[in-house]
Swiss-Prot record:
The active site is at K78, S153, S177. Its EC number is 6.3.5.7. Keywords: ATP-binding, Ligase, Nucleotide-binding, Protein biosynthesis. This is Glutamyl-tRNA(Gln) amidotransferase subunit A. It comes from the Bacteria. Allows the formation of correctly charged Gln-tRNA(Gln) through the transamidation of misacylated Glu-tRNA(Gln) in organisms which lack glutaminyl-tRNA synthetase. The reaction takes place in the presence of glutamine and ATP through an activated gamma-phospho-Glu-tRNA(Gln). GO terms for biological process: translation. It comes from Borreliella burgdorferi (strain ATCC 35210 / DSM 4680 / CIP 102532 / B31). InterPro entries: Amidase, Amidase_CS, Amidase_dom, AS_sf, GatA. It catalyses: L-glutamyl-tRNA(Gln) + L-glutamine + ATP + H2O = L-glutaminyl-tRNA(Gln) + L-glutamate + ADP + phosphate + H(+). Belongs to the amidase family. GatA subfamily. GO terms for molecular function: ATP binding; glutaminyl-tRNA synthase (glutamine-hydrolyzing) activity. NCBIfam families: gatA. Heterotrimer of A, B and C subunits.
Length: 481
């Protein structure tokens, strides 16, 4: 049996029936990592995870299983989620050497229930990017074709699951940062409803949109981990309860479900391979008795602009804390305070991060605040969110391709950053309206590159979305393990 090709639920079944030790399974994943380090999915593999695995094996031997429903479950973690006594750098030189003094709420809930954290994964610096090339630690490669990007910003978390270096991983999703790399690497990527998982301990990029998400080969694993990590948290006032009676996920017919396709997201705008796959996806769903209607949402044309106005504004505020006085790496020259701030941030932040900070400050300036930022917030709250709420009164889910484009070639020089930002046009919808969304691996092109399909559900109906996705995977025969 290949011990590095298992779901979390299968791992637990094997260890609870004493057919395998947690240590041996973890060692198989670590060996895969050692053999394929060039993918650069991990920033650090935790050596102490092997000792924790041994300790849990002893617990199993002595039948000490009380309150450990996730025992034996191995999880990699994106480098912007706090783990006590572990390095946290957000893949930035400016945080080099910083050790987190506390656990994020999601991490604490996983640890308390027996999960083992096995490493921290690469990412675009401060979660700003769509390729996972903007990292202090170098680019993460796509395991399906190493000449192409894996997508970002949670590219490392996607890569370690796709390359069977971890059975499950945590990422963060602000505008598609879980779903895009999941689509590009041929695995499942799930973003919960806004507030469904506590953001306490997640390094902030754009607080209105940030959400911890999951990568896996198994929809059941996603539902299980969501069950044990979701819910309100006194440390995060935006957190909410989302658990409902759709768990455990049930096998049900797709017959009679109502799906919406947004007219303005035209197939004419998509890469040819993506357009063909999306057309086939719709035909496959229709053949299962699903109703699909095309709806017009003219405000969709504002979606990307609104996201790239609000997110850099919030980023410019959130990243103001990285001055060199409290966190991470410091320069040692004797400078005035303002010169110290300027030199520190100029030296240790990447060009992409500086670009978004400058844009955010520009949009907040007295001259432009009401023209851009205030207007974007007004359109989002008064037009876009109500329009989608109205749409969900007559449909169960919205379907789109996860991305209009295929993976980019590594090292592609984006002289116009908007070309890269355009890859987020389908995924930002769920973040702006606070809805859950998932990317399903659907097809591959002639170069072996994966094309994913996105399903968006109703806000706070995460398990309903996962249940429907399970049945889509089952009835369409989509690949998984």
């Amino acid at each position: 049996m290949d011990l590095s090709n298992l779901t979390l639920t299968k791992i637990q079944e094997l260890v609870l029936t004493r057919k395998c030790k947690i240590y041996d399974i973890l060692l198989a994943y670590k060996n895969n990592y050692e053999l394929n380090k060039d993918i650069n999915g991990y920033i650090e593999f935790f050596d102490d995870s092997l000792e924790i695995a041994k300790r849990y094996d002893d617990c199993l031997k002595n039948c000490e299983l009380e309150d450990l429903p996730l025992i034996g479950m191995l999880i990699a973690v994106k480098d912007n989620i706090s783990i006590q006594d572990k390095s946290l750098t957000c893949a930035s030189e400016i945080l080099k050497g910083y050790i987190s003094p506390y656990d994020a709420t999601v991490i604490k809930r996983l640890k308390n229930k027996g999960a083992i954290l096995i490493g921290r994964t690469n990412m675009d610096e401060f979660a700003m990017g769509s390729t996972c090339e903007f990292s202090y630690y170098g680019a993460t490669l796509n395991p399906l074709n190493r000449e192409y990007v894996i997508g970002g910003s949670s590219g490392g978390s996607a890569a370690v699951v796709a390359a069977f270096q971890a059975p499950f991983s945590l990422g963060s999703d602000t505008g598609g940062s879980v779903r895009l790399p999941a689509s590009f690497s041929g695995i499942l990527g799930f973003k919960p409803s806004y507030g469904g998982l506590s953001r306490y301990g997640l390094a902030s990029y754009a607080s209105s949109f940030d959400q911890i998400g999951f990568f896996s080969h198994s929809i059941e694993d996603i539902a299980l981990i969501l069950k044990h990590t979701c819910g309100s948290d006194k440390m995060d006032s935006t957190s909410v309860d989302i658990f409902d009676d759709f768990y455990p996920l049930k096998i049900e017919s797709l017959q009679g479900k109502n799906l919406a396709v947004i007219k303005e997201l035209s197939e004419d705008l998509m890469d040819k391979n993506v357009a063909n796959s999306f057309a086939k996806f719709k035909l496959d769903l229709l053949s299962k008795g699903i109703n699909i209607k095309e709806v017009s949402i003219e405000e969709i044309n504002f979606i990307l602009s609104i996201y790239y106005i609000i997110s850099p504004v919030e980023a410019s505020s959130n990243l103001a804390r990285y001055t060199g006085l409290c966190y991470g790496k410091r320069i040692s020259e004797g400078l005035s305070l303002n010169d110290f701030y300027f030199k520190h941030r100029s030296n240790f932040l990447s060009e992409e991060v500086k670009r978004r900070i400058v844009l955010g400050n520009y949009l907040l300036s007295e001259r432009y605040d009401s023209k851009y930022y205030a207007k974007a917030c007004e359109i989002l709250q008064n037009l876009i969110i109500p329009k989608f709420n109205k749409l969900f009164e007559s449909c169960d889910f919205i379907i789109t391709p996860t991305s209009f484009v295929k993976p980019f070639r590594l090292g592609l020089d984006f002289d116009d950053p908007v070309k890269m930002y355009y890859s987020d046009i389908c995924t930002v919808i769920a973040n702006l309206i606070g809805a859950p969304a998932i990317s399903l691996p659907y097809s591959k092109d002639e170069e072996g590159l994966s094309i994913g399909m996105q399903i968006i559900g109703r806000s706070k109906k995460d398990f309903e979305l996962l249940s429907f996705s399970k049945n889509v995977i089952r009835e369409l025969g989509l690949n998984g393990i």
